[in-house]
Amino acid sequence: MRSKRFEALAKRPVNQDGFVKEWIEEGFIAMESPNDPKPSIKIVNGTVTELDGKSASEFDLIDHFIARYGINLARAEEVMAMDSVKLANMLCDPNVKRKDIVPLTTAMTPAKIVEVVSHMNVVEMMMAMQKMRARRTPSQQAHVTNVKDNPVQIAADAAEGAWRGFDEQETTVAVARYAPFNAIALLVGSQVGRPGVLTQCSLEEATELKLGMLGHTCYAETISVYGTEPVFTDGDDTPWSKGFLASSYASRGLKMRFTSGSGSEVQMGYAEGKSMLYLEARCIYITKAAGVQGLQNGSVSCIGVPSAVPSGIRAVLAENLICSSLDLECASSNDQTFTHSDMRRTARLLMQFLPGTDFISSGYSAVPNYDNMFAGSNEDAEDFDDYNVLQRDLKVDGGLRPVREEDVIAIRNKAARALQAVFAGMGLPPITDEEVEAATYAHGSKDMPERNIVEDIKFAQEIINKNRNGLEVVKALAQGGFTDVAQDMLNIQKAKLTGDYLHTSAIIVGDGQVLSAVNDVNDYAGPATGYRLQGERWEEIKNIPGALDPNELG
């Protein structure tokens, strides 16, 4: 006979999740694998001759790249000789300023920085993250996708997402050839919601770069790097080829970051018996070595792997912290869904939500998860109210704000009509008034009428083949009566020429002002310092629609 208690527990959502015991030989260990190398460095005449237990003759491609470009050699031997526990204390001590820590962390080897953070529990890591993130002001990024690649819905959802507070928005495709329409719809909708929101369309790398060069996106993120050489070469890549791609984006005025995440090498079968965190540290150093301003990490689409082993969610926070400690922008994931448990997914979110990161999620699904073409997110559109209440309960700025239904309806309608004008002005397949009406009130693609997919794809490919650029979109908006949106779209193109938003951790806020690690320096040094939720922003977060006003009762 079974215990009734255990029968009830067996039905709990968390017991639908997958868990696995550590399997060190295959890399199923989050942190502190016995196979991880001991920290070491030897430098002869300015050249690294030993790195983390390997002599130069044993270096793989990643070791060579990191040794040449990724470590501040001027202080490396000094820092490597320091006690790792002392360094861990310095990281989480608010009395030790960020500007004094970065010269030390950037002089460590991958094995050394992993050893340092391994001495820290999650509360200490969050204390460190609060101080070490590059930009003073935390922010949020959204996914805006749908299973039908419906551009009208993307425009409306993007407008709502921007209105709710997302500073970056990302789309991808169900059908690859739809990409130009998705990119244009996302950018138009985002500028309707809030001028200055940055957008990207995640695709294979050649098409993604092409769309950026045509002016249909503002940044790139999904340029993946890996922690073992076989995973790189399996994809016909090297750290050098990724660095070249990064420079291609930056030279065209497009912000970009790399993407990595613990567990990717395990998934590919090339973990070499090392811990997930150690391999991820190598990815972070590759990013630094390539001269890239930031990184999306935190396991991202591989989250099912670290979350299945002990200390896995702690390791995810640790990799975010290492990223910030190397003076990089950190888009800290809270991305792909990994659990059936609401309690567990909230705990995973709080690791980044509470201290704040450059982008707490990368991204938060601004659509219901059934429409999320990134395989679902840890948080989706049905969590907006919960998220706003969390901000209010804890007095934490998570990047979003409460909104009114009538405002959202109006902004969605304007975005759909603006895209209708773009399609008409560019001679693309027409958007009907019925579609505009549906997108205005839709929750997801189940609420949208069908489009002629064959016709859409044909014209979407013409965008690429005929090099139809962002200025054509601006012109169509102006001719269609949306002069304000046209100006905002033009301003986004101008931003690529000035280049200010290529700085570390840059976002564009009101009136085209760029906030970055250059002019919004994180100056946290304990209580009453650093970013504080106060003034108009706190009033905005407090004012949730469901709060009763005592003056109106009775």
Curated annotation (Swiss-Prot):
InterPro entries, per the entry: Cbl-dep_enz_cat, Diol/glycerol_deHase_lsu_sf, Diol/glycerol_deHydtase_lsu
One GO MF term attached to the UniProt entry: cobalamin binding
Classification via SUPFAM superfamilies: Cobalamin (vitamin B12)-dependent enzymes
Any Gene Ontology biological process: propanediol catabolic process
Co-factor requirement: adenosylcob(III)alamin
Entry-linked Pfam families: Dehydratase_LU
Compartments, record wording: Bacterial microcompartment
GO cellular component term of the entry, any: bacterial microcompartment
EC number: 4.2.1.28
Major localization listed first in the record, in broad terms: other
Protein's pathway: Polyol metabolism; 1,2-propanediol degradation
Superkingdom per UniProt: Bacteria
Name of the top EC class for this enzyme: lyase
Reactions listed under catalytic activity: propane-1,2-diol = propanal + H2O
Keyword RNA-binding among record annotations: no
Keyword line: Bacterial microcompartment, Cobalamin, Cobalt, Lyase
Function: Part of the PduCDE complex that catalyzes the dehydration of 1,2-propanediol (1,2-PD) to propionaldehyde. This subunit is directly targeted to the bacterial microcompartment (BMC).
Record family assignment: Belongs to the diol/glycerol dehydratase large subunit family.
Subunit (UniProt): The propanediol dehydratase enzyme is a heterotrimeric complex composed of a large (PduC), a medium (PduD) and a small (PduE) subunit.
Name the UniProt record assigns to this protein: Propanediol dehydratase large subunit
Organism: Citrobacter freundii
